[in-house]
Curated annotation (Swiss-Prot):
Co-factor(s): heme
Gene responsible for this protein: avaH
Residue spans crossing the bilayer: 243-263
Keyword check for Membrane: yes
Enzyme Commission (EC) number: 1.-.-.-
Keyword Glycosyltransferase: no
Keywords: Heme, Iron, Membrane, Metal-binding, Monooxygenase, Oxidoreductase, Transmembrane, Transmembrane helix
Any one GO BP annotation for this protein: secondary metabolic process
Protein name in UniProt: Cytochrome P450 monooxygenase avaH
GO MF annotations, alphabetized: heme binding; iron ion binding; monooxygenase activity; oxidoreductase activity, acting on paired donors, with incorporation or reduction of molecular oxygen
Length: 456
């Protein structure tokens, strides 16, 4: 590598966002791809303009691979000890099959877990007093506990040793993964062995657990190829698939939640905390039977606020990654040749902050998508939904590889914000710590502290 390229690559760790934004202004607006150097993803990335989004998502997996690009980020063989979680992504198929339509089944258990965790993290009002909490860590514990109900059931969701281990694994998966995996396995492996035993002895008509772990076992048991079935039913591989599911779910949902609450601290004059409280209170006052999927769906203002946070802040400046796997490379519609092994993607943060797609894009408007939803245009209203992906909203991806868990994520985000505002007052002693760009990712300021107090 030439010295100039080495220096450029090193600088990309902290300047990638700036370079992509500059390239977007100079090239993407002219419908031209451009290249940025990257130390974290050798040797460089090709950034496509928004006009090529459809071309990207319609490309064959054998030409532009989603899974190979993902593996370059998560290093599945080293971080999770298996490449099968991506070459045969059963957990993705299962999440798409069960979670999109299963929210109502989980709602009572998820709400109970949310309230219990908030009692522990933010106080239960007995005695009623203000307390200081680390915002990022407390929200991470809340999200992790709620997701655990859906992934592994209530027993492990309430096991604090397991919750501590799985949270550490999610945060530090690339650092001390061997030790952390052992801690998780010590709790998860006995449950897997019990489930495998019970599944083999289960009689027709008998009830069985309804969570990700059981769905995995059922799917693996139904594989027709005996050799594949034997491999997939190895308990260690089941652990790996569960860990991967946590990794792609908990941290990203928590970042979105943290960004949403942090925006409230940066824009206190807008008083979004009270806005969300008022909406949630009105919905529950109509019917005191508690949260249902139908009621969560009515949190339009909260949903708009979360989606605007994702648009305005986001968590990455380069998304919709694909890796060129065609041996001879591929040619884009404008004639640009991409050699084998090239990583391409879209400048998501720049697109989300483009006035052509979002009027006054550089200003935060928590009601932006509520206004669109209340418009007379049916297509515009549907596009305002948090779970709606498009060429101009890429937070959950787009096309056939759009995030399959986004429906559960949306419900969790809305539910947490509603419950927090209903149950607590919040004070910002100082503005939230600024997040920082590292490579193509936005890292939350994890030292932000807020004061919270249970409402009367």
């Amino acid at each position: 590598m030439a010295l100039s390229q080495a220096v450029t690559s090193r600088a990309s760790v902290f300047k990638s966002k700036t370079w992509i934004d500059t390239g977007y202004r100079l090239h993407s607006r002219e419908n031209k791809p451009f290249m940025v150097s990257s130390l974290l993803e050798e040797p460089s990335l090709v950034v496509l303009p928004p006009s090529m989004t459809t071309e990207l998502i319609l490309a064959k997996e054998t030409d532009l691979s989603f899974w190979h690009a993902l593996d370059d980020i998560v290093f599945s063989e080293h971080a999770f000890y298996s490449t099968r979680i991506l070459s045969l992504p059963l957990q993705t198929t299962i999440i798409r099959r069960h979670l999109a339509s299963g929210a109502q089944r989980f709602m009572p258990a998820v709400v109970r877990q949310l309230r219990n965790t908030l009692d522990r993290e933010w106080g239960s009002g007995k005695p009623k007093q203000w307390r200081s909490v680390n915002l990022f860590n407390s929200l991470l514990n809340v999200v992790n506990n709620m997701v655990s109900v859906v992934f592994v059931g209530t027993d492990l969701a309430n096991d604090q040793d397991f919750q501590t281990s799985i949270t550490k694994h999610t945060e530090q998966v690339f650092l001390t993964m061997s030790v952390l995996r052992m801690e998780v396995e010590s709790k998860l492996m006995p449950l897997i062995m019990e489930r495998l035993k019970n599944s083999s002895e289960l009689k027709a008509g008998q009830d069985k657990p309804d969570d990700l772990l059981q769905w995995l076992i059922d799917c693996q048991t139904s594989l027709k190829d005996p050799a594949e079935r034997a491999i997939e039913l190895e308990p260690s591989l089941i652990v790996t698939r569960v860990l991967m599911s946590y990794f792609v779910s908990v941290f990203l949902v928590n970042v979105a939640l943290f960004n949403a609450v942090s925006i409230m601290g940066r824009l206190p004059e807008a008083d979004y905390w009270s806005e969300i409280y008022t909406e949630a209170r009105k919905i529950l006052d109509v019917d005191e039977h508690g949260w249902t999927k139908e009621k969560v769906d009515k949190l339009w203002k909260t949903e708009s606020f979360v989606k605007e946070t994702m648009r305005f802040v986001g968590d990455a400046c380069f998304e919709m990654r694909r890796k060129v796997m065609a041996p001879t490379g591929i040619n884009l519609s404008d004639g640009t040749h991409l050699p084998f092994g090239t990583t391409v993607g879209l400048p998501s943060n720049a697109i989300h902050n483009d006035d052509r797609f979002y009027p006054q894009a550089t200003s935060f408007d928590g009601l932006r998508f509520l206004k669109l939803r209340e418009s007379d245009d049916g297509n515009t209203a549907r596009g305002s939904l948090l779970t709606a992906t498009s060429n101009t909203f890429l937070q959950f991806g787009h096309g056939r590889h759009g995030c399959p868990g986004r429906f559960l994520a949306a419900d969790i985000l809305k539910l947490i914000l509603a419950e927090m505002t209903l149950r607590y007052e919040i004070k910002w002693d100082e503005k939230p710590e600024e997040s920082s760009w590292f490579g193509n990712s936005l890292l939350p300021g994890q030292n932000t502290v807020v004061s919270v107090c249970p409402r009367d």
